[in-house]
A protein has these predicted regions:
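Conserved N-terminal entry element of GNAT/NAT acetyltransferase domains
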Residues: 1-12, 163
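Conserved acyl-donor/pantetheine-binding loop and adjacent beta-alpha core of acyl/acetyltransferases
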Residues: 63-96
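A short helix-loop-beta-strand connector motif used in the catalytic cores of GNAT acetyltransferases and
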Residues: 46-60
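Conserved acetyl-CoA-binding loop of GNAT-fold acetyltransferases
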Residues: 142-152
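Conserved acetyl-CoA-binding loop-helix of GNAT-fold acetyltransferases
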Residues: 104-117, 142-143
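Conserved GNAT acetyl-CoA-binding A-motif
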Residues: 119-132
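Conserved GNAT-fold acetyl-CoA-binding loop/helix
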Residues: 25-48
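A short, internal acetyl-CoA/4′-phosphopantetheine-binding micro-motif in the GNAT/acyltransferase core
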Residues: 93-104, 131
């Protein structure tokens, strides 16, 4: 696998973030969901609809020839319109998606580290996420300093303190 670089996400990355959201939703190839089903599900589309709103931040990983290989971004949600990993107003929730051929190559770690730094620089005290308990990415989140604060069904809500 060749190298990759990480850059800040921009408003024109909306389609790319949507692609990576579909990758994140389909982490388990045995239970893969059709793209249109993921996009029609508000639980997922919530994370990309209207990108880049005030308070949104994120990073994109690109391989050779600037081909996108992954993205990690965060978004603020209101208490009356929460995401899966909502823990409170003012706490951004992140999502991470990496193309399958680039998984286990350091892309997810690089993106996660960059987004955590970005959220910290934006003044956030914490950042949260929601992950299915069987998703191997849960180990990435644990080693990056995220800890479980709630479990519901097959999902865990995790938080990392930024200051």
């Amino acid at each position: 696998m060749e190298g990759f670089r990480v850059r800040d996400a921009v408003p024109s990355d909306a389609r790319l973030l949507t692609d990576m959201m579909v990758e994140a939703a389909n982490w388990n190839w045995r239970q893969s969901r059709p793209r249109m089903a993921v996009l029609a599900d508000r639980d997922f589309s919530h994370y990309v609809s209207g990108w880049q709103k005030p308070g949104d931040g994120g990073c994109v990983a690109e391989g050779d020839e600037d081909s996108p290989v992954g993205a990690c971004w965060y978004r603020l949600f209101a208490a009356n319109d929460p995401g899966h990993g909502f823990v409170g107003p003012g706490v951004p929730e992140l999502i991470l998606g990496v193309s399958p051929v680039w998984r286990a190559q350091g892309v997810g770690r690089a993106l996660l580290d960059a987004v955590v730094a970005q959220a910290r620089a934006a003044g956030h005290a914490r950042i949260s996420l929601s992950v299915e308990r069987d998703n191997y990415a849960i180990n990435l989140y644990r080693t990056a300093g995220f800890f479980r604060i709630a479990s519901t069904g097959s999902r865990e809500t995790m938080v990392r303190t930024l200051r």
